Amino acid sequence: MSQNPYAPPGADIEDVRRPSDEDGRFIESGHVVAAGRGASWWGEAWSLFKAAPGMWILTLLAFFVLYALVAIIPVLNFFAGFVAMLMGTGLLIGCDDLHRGDPLRVGHLFAAFKTRPGRLIVLVVVTGLLSILAMLVAVLPFGLSMLPILFGMEDMDTSLMTGTLLVSILLIFLIFLALSIPIYMAYWFAPLLIVKQDFGVGKAMLCSLKACAMNFVPFLLYGLVGLVLTIVAMIPLFLGFLILIPMIIASIYTAYRDIFFIQR
């Protein structure tokens, strides 16, 4: 295996499943873990970051540079979201390699481009369409009900109109949030299930949704810890995000291993 950190991923990355005794028994829809595990995912993510902190930061900077280059080029910028998702999934593959004792490399950013990229792109499209549908469901009823108010502003008290608009905006936000949560739950583990377990898009999203739903309490604690870490990361001129973003990626992987595997 080449030790050059800039070398493209070799065959060891393409063979992403690589079952071993360390994996434990895979549970297709996941299993319930203790509530405190939500905090432990961050601790285990920190261990993965500590295994190669310099390479994590270098890879993250390379991610931002590549994404920016794609985003500013006309026509190609349409695909920026797909490129970002594929590179992010590549970093999840890198987490798996780190877990197994292999080095993290900048080349991991391109690992998912060779590992079922078609399914991953479909996953992004499906998630995007579901998000648009959720927005339409949230906006349309209130948007239609607001038309008489907007066209009859001269006949309505300004304070009453403002209050009605604010209430409508709040309700739209809450409805969209309620509809978005299951969408993101369905997406959360789907990339890993696609590249690591060879799942189809629909099956991966359904299993991810079930796994997140049955572990709502651990995820609640996970989110609270993440909120605290985000606040801390903002203090030193946002430089803490150079550590926090890799930890977020790694925490998705550690949660995946915790929920979908039972150690023998």
Residue ranges and their predicted role:
Residues 13, 151, 201-202:
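A broad, structure-centric signal for solvent-exposed, well-ordered loop/edge residues
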Residues 8, 16, 100, 161, ...:
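A generic signature of intrinsically disordered, low-complexity regions enriched in glycine/proline
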Residues 36-66, 103-133, 165-173, 182-234, ...:
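Interfacial aromatic "cap" segments that immediately flank transmembrane helices
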Residues 1-44, 262-264:
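Low-complexity, intrinsically disordered extramembrane tails and loops of integral membrane proteins
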